[in-house]
Amino acid sequence: MYGWINLDKPCGISSASAVNLVKKILNVKKVGHAGTLDPLASGVLPIAIGEATKVMPYAVDVVKSYLFTVQWGEQRTTDDIEGKIVAKSDIVPSSEDIKKAIPNFIGLLRQVPPNFSAVHVNGVRAFKLARNGQDVSLTSRDVNVLKLKLLSADQENNKADFYLLCKKGVYVRSIARDLGIELGCLGYVRKLQRVRVGCFRKKNAITLEMLKMLYNNSRKCSYLLPLWYVLQDMKHLNDVFSDIQIKKIKNGQNIELNNLYVVRNCGICYVSTGNVPVAICSIVNSVVRPVRIFNV
């Protein structure tokens, strides 16, 4: 069994726990996820099964989008609803105030991750240090926010809803924290849902309950997306090479192409035969070099 599951992760469990539940439901050992989602967040969590784990890097460095709610008036240790209150503010920002501040959070930015995050500090996860009461001082890093839009502002309940489109590495909790500081009202994430990870969309995602039902009722892998699902932007070469050449590629051997091949300099590509995955290859100067070989 190999392929992708577009999982709709529920609130209350970690991404690692979601992976373990998928392992248990499908009775498979080789499972991974592309892009951690906080336990208190819900939404799209791409799950790689079997040989699809070899193409996980191509599912991580992609555009992501979120819907989230910021609660104003408080700053919390975790920058979400789970943390302890460390500061308060009586300021209630208006829609106009929020819209004026938003441009400062779009584009190439320097962002400091939350102290309660999976960022490594001297080989230890920051959240582990923070939980043990140790001082955590994280450095800022480059992130890219493509779009940040105010969807609604509820002054009566002092909260606001947003849509975010960004590249990898952006922490929504940091945006809520920094936006609250910018407005002088403080803030933290009250609700967070990821609605897109590259080609994976929320509207097509399935829950753990749906996965279990589909597996028990059919066992035909109807819930699995193909391995190449995350490689749609990569050049695909199907039934281009001979059986002998395919065998060499599967054995990790380089092969040289003659001038009859129009693909002799196409860079990174996905190779298959009969639409069965063979390998990710690099083809430069008429030489095919296997980069990732699929054992299917």
Curated annotation (Swiss-Prot):
Catalytic residue list: D38 (nucleophile)
Molecular function as annotated in GO: RNA binding; tRNA pseudouridine(55) synthase activity
InterPro entries: PsdUridine_synth_cat_dom_sf (IPR020103), PsdUridine_synth_N (IPR002501), tRNA_psdUridine_synth_TruB (IPR014780), TruB_C (IPR032819)
UniProt-listed Enzyme Commission number(s): 5.4.99.25
Root EC class: isomerase
Catalysed reactions, semicolon-separated: uridine(55) in tRNA = pseudouridine(55) in tRNA
NCBIfam families: TruB
HAMAP family in the record: TruB_bact (MF_01080)
Similarity comment: family membership: Belongs to the pseudouridine synthase TruB family. Type 1 subfamily.
Protein name per the record: tRNA pseudouridine synthase B
Lineage of the species this protein comes from: Bacteria, Pseudomonadati, Pseudomonadota, Alphaproteobacteria, Rickettsiales
Gene this protein is translated from: truB
